[in-house]
Swiss-Prot record:
This is 1-deoxy-D-xylulose 5-phosphate reductoisomerase. The lineage of its organism: Bacteria, Pseudomonadati, Pseudomonadota, Betaproteobacteria, Burkholderiales. It comes from Cupriavidus pinatubonensis (strain JMP 134 / LMG 1197) (Cupriavidus necator (strain JMP 134)). GO terms for biological process: isopentenyl diphosphate biosynthetic process, methylerythritol 4-phosphate pathway involved in terpenoid biosynthetic process. NCBIfam families: Dxr, PRK05447.1-1, PRK12464.1. The gene is dxr. SUPFAM superfamilies: 1-deoxy-D-xylulose-5-phosphate reductoisomerase, C-terminal domain, Glyceraldehyde-3-phosphate dehydrogenase-like, C-terminal domain, NAD(P)-binding Rossmann-fold domains. Disulfide bonds: none annotated.
Amino acid sequence: MHRITILGATGSIGESTLDVVRRHADRYAVHALTAHRQVQKLAASCIEFRPARAVVGTSEAAAELEALLRMAGVKTEVSHGEAALESVASDAQTDSVMAAIVGAAGLRPTLAAARAGKRVLLANKEALVMSGRIFMDAVREHGATLLPIDSEHNAIFQCLPANDQRYRAGVAKVVLTASGGPFRTRDPATLHDITPDQACAHPNWVMGRKISVDSATMMNKGLEVIEAHWLFGAPAEHIEVLIHPQSIVHSMVAYRDGSVLAQLGNPDMRTPIAYGLAYPERIDAGVSPLDLTLAGALNFEKPDLVRFPCLALAFDALRAGGVAPAVLNAANEVAVEAFLQGGIRFTDIARIVGNVLEKAPHGAADSLECVLEADQLARQSARACLQDVTTSAVR
């Protein structure tokens, strides 16, 4: 029985992972589940899957969860806090760790899993964006297995040679596809009027609010560009982004002989999740098979960097190197949260991120401490920028 820990069990990736596990109860057992504050949802999953351990964000949430599980007669051990997250991620009793905590909060536990030599199913792109070299060194030094779960990187992983998943001779470039989000054809002059609800209404994917906004700005694709650099060793000039509104082609690898290999499928995160769980086998993910006769035309176009300045900022951060990607991510997290709370306009997100990236010192990312310090300084700078934003709050 393969034992799994799910970091971020109440988010969209966590819930999709549990759905796949539910379909294969004969081969997977849940060892630990974590959530920050969604105690009711976590309790329901603990009652169903009976994990040995559960972790929440605060002592208050832990007390609430313990009470709910006690009433249900479930003896899951409950703990809270960052140290507890790192503990379950590196627990000797778990085989695979689904790293699905959104944002910088997922960095430490995901790194702990790598350092413990786990099979890491990486859905938390920020771990690589912030600490790419540190993270990849940990994977190599401790014998961890790293399997990308983002649909784009999972697609590239599948399209690279089976005996060498790194970016090697013979590969001309990797191509990340992007839906373009809900504003792909909207007049850029009207983007300042976008509301949080509009930004979260993705045309193809069901996702959490933060990643939905990142998709709308294309910062999500920018972060994926940085992630692809570290996963596959691809320099910025060998990473291309194409808008593909149908979200059927999840990404491609172009080879020097003119061949292009692509991975296709219906837009459902259970496909890459099932791939990561069972690799190198294939299992039923509960996803309807792709019918190309119904899919119709598949369109591709270059991204408009006037409409999507966040994508250009991400390429800038990748080329700058060092802690610049961590600065980019931190500033974006602060700006997106402010937008979701109605404090700034949609177009202020890129403006704030650009200002912070321009002003921040771009030191080397030599240690986790350097990365986390850059993260905190960038957040402080972004919050200062919020005070300077003169646009009225979105309502």
